[in-house]
Regions:
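Transmembrane-helix signature of polytopic, membrane-embedded enzymes
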Residues: 36-38, 125-147, 164-165, 183-184, ...
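Transmembrane-helix motifs of polytopic, lipid-linked glycan transferases
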Residues: 41, 112-132, 169
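Loop-to-helix entry region of an early transmembrane alpha helix in multi-pass inner-membrane enzymes
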Residues: 90, 94, 103-120
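Membrane-interface transmembrane helices that cradle and orient dolichyl/undecaprenyl
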Residues: 136, 170-188, 215-222, 291-298
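Short acidic/glycine- and proline-prone juxtamembrane loop motifs at membrane-interface regions
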Residues: 155-163
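Membrane-interface alpha helices of multi-pass inner-membrane proteins
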Residues: 184-201, 207-213, 241
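Perimembrane helix-loop-helix junctions
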Residues: 206-240
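Transmembrane-lumen/periplasm boundary regions of multi-pass, lipid-linked membrane glycan transferases
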Residues: 228-298
Length: 298
């Protein structure tokens, strides 16, 4: 932030932020072709090298084995919740089904797909970092994203590999409430959030936060209360649209009870873990994140 203050010392914080966002948006378009290909190659290589010990290993993690089984059986006409049970959303199994349809053997198919999502997340994070730092530092942040995602459970094809990039995309779209197309970008962000919900429902709080931030922007833009209520309803409808669509599908085929129980009831019937939600060793495990957070605030 000190760099922003030096460049725009005469403006308010809001003006400085808006100017920095505009500067990031005005990155030369040619950089998205030749000039940025090296970046995609670098991040892809970094992701492959870091994840190499796990690629091709069926036992890299246990959850994906079930996701892959259900996804592959979807191609044979079987359905999640009705024929094969798990509490994860339909969209996650669809992703694994698409990976299986690629023709690559499991686990290569879904692990390489997850690697692609990791690279996309790194690119999105770099885009966010460019609002505050130079290109080199932003690239380091993108590489650090790949490292941390690998260390903290997304070394194979856990759900975070897929829905974290969606959250980063939402942040990019709604971050600038003064953007001339802020509302249009917010509509798109809410749809992305809805798709992320179909990967894992635990992204709901983040989606609500981004929706409220976008709504605050409309309030600052002078929208009336009735307009804000209508916009909020539209945000909610777009965010729930993918899940509603899946629910209507199961209702049409007579599988509504199975869908409802798996998605919205079974979670509350889970037995608590013996160690509790947070084990004692987690404190040490998250210390690197605390250090990075403090450094970032500085």
């Amino acid at each position: 932030m000190r760099g922003i203050v030096r460049n725009h010392g005469g403006g308010t914080v809001g003006q400085m932020t808006a100017m920095s966002l505009d500067r990031a948006d005005s990155t030369p378009k040619s950089g998205a072709s030749r000039g940025e290909l090296w970046l995609v190659a670098l991040l892809t290589l970094g992701a492959l090298v870091l994840r190499l010990p796990f690629l091709g290993d069926h036992n890299a993690d246990i959850d994906e084995q079930l996701y892959a089984l259900i996804g592959s059986q979807m191609l044979q006409g079987q359905l999640p919740f009705v024929d094969l049970w798990d509490r994860k959303p339909f969209g996650l199994f669809l992703l694994f089904g698409l990976a299986d349809a690629s023709g690559l053997p499991a686990p290569w198919s879904y692990q390489l797909m997850a690697t692609g999502f990791i690279v996309i997340g790194a690119l999105l994070l770099r885009r966010l970092a460019l609002l505050l730092v130079d290109r080199g530092t932003a690239t380091v942040a993108a590489l650090l994203y790949i490292v941390l995602m690998t260390i903290y459970g997304s070394h194979s094809a856990q759900t975070e590999a897929f829905h974290v990039p969606a959250m980063l995309a939402m942040a990019l779209l709604v971050r600038d409430i003064r953007h001339p197309n802020a509302l249009r970008r917010a509509w798109f962000a809410m749809l992305i959030g809805g798709l992320a919900l179909q990967v894992k429902y635990t992204v709901f709080p983040q989606c609500v936060f981004f929706g409220l931030w976008a709504l605050w922007g409309r309030y600052r833009a002078g929208r009336t209360l009735s307009q804000l209520v209508a916009i909020a309803a539209g945000f909610a409808a777009l965010g729930l649209l993918p899940t509603i669509g899946v629910g209507l599908f199961y209702l049409a085929i007579g599988g509504w009870e199975e869908f409802w129980f798996a998605n919205f009831v079974s979670f509350f019937l889970r037995a608590p873990a013996p160690m509790g939600r947070f084990a004692d060793q987690y404190t040490i495990f998250v210390m690197p994140l605390v250090v990075l957070t403090v450094a970032g605030l500085y």
